[in-house]
Regions:
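Acidic, serine/threonine-rich low-complexity disordered tracts
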Residues: 1-10, 49-149
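An acidic-aromatic
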Residues: 1-33
Length: 149
């Protein structure tokens, strides 16, 4: 896109605070964002993740997120059936907007929406790759599938 801007922030690990453009925001320990949650689901076991709530920040607003193991399914990639843990990802807003980190865009606006249904299929053995993901909102479903094993 054509956006360019300046980010001015400082994180202080001694008290877990973030100073952003002069605003002081306390940051809970081990806070997640959408990208660290995706990394977590590809690295940790379904037993560990299932139903556990994680503190989450999304675009300066506090949320909490959890993975719910929905099923174990085969996902076809090329000619191969890959056994996958099928998760639903719940995200709930738990606080007010503290800061606006960047201009809004469609993905970031809607990925944490309470109206979205988020699903992720993770390879059960081996690399624990995310082989399929879908987001449904406002009657539209977007699906991403790994093309080649």
């Amino acid at each position: 896109g054509s956006y360019s801007g300046i980010l001015n922030c400082k994180y202080d690990s001694t008290d877990s605070s973030l100073t952003y453009n002069g605003n002081l925001v306390s940051v809970p320990d081990s806070i997640q964002n959408i990208f660290t949650l995706l990394a977590r689901v590809s690295r940790q076991s379904s037993d560990y993740l299932d139903t556990k709530w994680f503190p989450m920040d999304h675009e300066g607003t506090r949320h909490r997120a959890r993975f719910l193991l929905a099923d174990i399914e085969k996902v076809k990639i090329g000619n191969e059936d890959i056994l996958c843990d099928h998760f639903r990802l719940d995200i709930e807003q738990s606080g007010e907007a503290l800061i606006q980190v960047s201009p809004y865009d469609y993905f970031m606006d809607h990925v944490a929406s309470a109206k979205a249904l988020r699903q992720i299929w993770v390879e059960q053995t081996g690399k624990r790759r995310i082989v399929k993901a879908s987001v449904s909102i406002y009657g539209m479903t977007v699906i991403a599938v790994l093309q080649d094993n």
